[in-house]
Amino acid sequence: MKRNLITILSAICLLLVVRCAEKRQQPVLTNKDVSKVIARMTDVMVHDVTNPPLASRFFAYTCLAGYEVMARDKQLKSMQGILNQYPAISASKQNELYNPQLSAVMAMFETAAKLQPSGSLMGKYEEGFLDSCRTIGFTDEVIDSSKSYAKFISKKILAYAKADGYRKISNYPRYKLKRTPGSWDLTPPAYMVPVEPYFNTVRTLVIDSASQFVPDAPVPFSTDKNSAFYKFLELSYSKSGDKLTQEEKNIANFWDCNPFAVQNDGHMLIGLKKISPGAHWMGVTAIACSQSQAGFAKTIEVNTMVAIGLMDAFICCWEDKYRTDRIRPETAIRRYIDPHWKPLLQTPPFPEYISGHSVISTTSAVILTHYFGNSFKYIDDVEQQFGVPPRQFNSFTQAATEAAISRFWGGIHFMDAIDNGILQGYRVGNWVVNKVSRGKGSK
């Protein structure tokens, strides 16, 4: 009897050892697996012609889903008490074979698939990802358990997203052009309606409100040739076309990132495939994580922080754009100086002040500098697939500064919108970094 009991106990111990060994020996995912989800999201955004503010919203909630999985596994700080109105997510009973890395990636896929209009494409990308997971050794039992938990977390994050007020925007009245001399007007060649005029009503993630960092007022509109505004007008007119150096043209085109760009083809307008400025900076984040050999958890964290910064930066920026409703250089120059003038870049379909590239690029640079330092050298080849040659940078700040001034050379922004946009970007970026660093969440 005693020998039988010893035999049974030995068998149980052996089984436990084997199961623990299986759990320890599970394959490991890397920063590239996280970055691939973001890259596939960007592909779908290009397909859907997703506007820049909305793209930032998709990135933020998708990254949050992956982040929440890792936070509940105690590998990252909880966002409860840090993000505005972030819910307490009740515990879920997950199978002991659940893998947090695998579940985090699948939570991102699940969330993106539900958020994006062509989300079914994300489902196909997820299938390919799971095939690769089986190849490296994940069992179907581990995959099924991890996917179940991923769906649980994704559902909670989607509920949080649903409550941010974006869905109410479709019920708001159609935006009406003011038709005053200095106000924004539709621009050629497509004369598109204004993009997301009510995005400032969306709940912010970290900052207190859309109006927390209101910039200085833009230089007042005036047709007086001695006025500050007219001097801005002349400056934009004089720094265009043949007066731009080839390097200035290269920089402007490198940072164009205009999903709405079209080209004339006879009587038709053909859409050009371009990513949003936020997608570009998420691509830079992937480069930084890969080059620094960041671990899986850190990669999830950095992507989430950059995405949070992008969304809050766009909310701030859009508050200023539609509050000031300022005329674009293209409209003003054609109206008051040269009716045949064209900027190097196509003018995006929303008001001029404040410069979105300046705000969101600086915000992203501040956050990335927090994680990787202020002398991080890298080659930006994010848009090489679209025929844009790579550029080398010595820091994220250098890249953000270049992105900002590119809008002046492109002929779509006045200088005060750029300078004040940079300042606003610093404020948002520092707020995100400081709020998360001193947040109440526990690791």
Regions found by a protein language model. Give the residues of each.
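Acidic/polar surface patches and capping/hinge elements
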Residues: A21-K443
